[in-house]
Amino acid sequence: MTPRISPERLAESLAELARIGGRPDGGVDRLAGSPADVEARQWLAARMREAGLEAGLDGVNNVFGHPPGAGPWLLLGSHTDTVPAGGRLDGAYGVLAALEVYQALAMAGHPAAARVALVSFHDEEGVSGHGFEGSEHFCASAPLASISGYLELHIEQGPRLEAEGLELGVVDAIVGIDRYDVALIGQANHAGTTPFSYRRDAGRAATRFIGGLRELVQGIEPRMVANVGALQLEPGAPNVVPGAARFVLEVRCPEPAALGAARARLEDELGRIATEEGCQLEFTPQTSWPAMAMFPGYVAALERVAQRSGLPWRRLESGAGHDAEILARHVPAAMLFVPSHEGLSHSPREHTDDRLLAQGCQALLDGTLEILGG
């Protein structure tokens, strides 16, 4: 008989962790390295030890728990740090679901309990750094040799599953992310005395590009998305034509070739608009994270679990970055998603019904057994 997780125990664990760094509005502040973050990691290590695991914090504050012995282990986990005013489920759900899976296996006396290890990675969010510091450190350190693979359960952080009436998602890829620093240099001038035809308006050049960005990237690949989250106009006065416009352009896509093709198309379009507006273009690649396919064997195993569960499900790519993409460079890795209510995440309003959280946790347990061979 397949071991069953305890929905009540999972809900209690989530509520207890949410109190560490909890906010009056229901959100959580556990920025990486903050006192609340450290307290949460110490709490988690204690919970792992109570469950019978050997657990502690490494040099960068990853929490790693494993059964006695030398492995190899299938690693389950995620992260417990948050963005400012974050939600209680992002990352934390995957960590505590992993703990619940181990507890269910151990309490049932199932032999798979000896083949499972748990982790909460440090600084996935990258609020003060580049992100994924913990998983990158883990993959460059000794414990990796004892890991046979990695599974991560997560809220979707987007609207697709809920909008389609689905309750489980099997992730087959994590998008690649490219960021570019863009500067359009025109000429500042008096906004009242300079006719439109004489202007070298960097603000107009920037907004022309941003206004057509959606159609441009979807013409490259329908699953591609792009964003300009902040636009700085200089000198920034209501009566001065902007002499410079600066912004960071972010592009995401699960298809590596399309992401590569986007760079030339975006730079060409910016160059065309800059020329028409009498501006100069500075286009500088900033950071790049490659798209990462999940391990086909693990994806197939999770699809079998989803099919047997009777839950409505689909295969999908992740539009957000996750520690799984770092692990996938080194060991087989895959992910499961549960719906996010109204697609909200990185927000105090982040929410998923307890029933869906429990179903996802059981799917993680079933997937663990499917991969380990029962």
Regions found by a protein language model. Give the residues of each.
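Midchain, well-structured core segments that form catalytic/ion-binding scaffolds
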Residues: 111, 124-127, 133-257
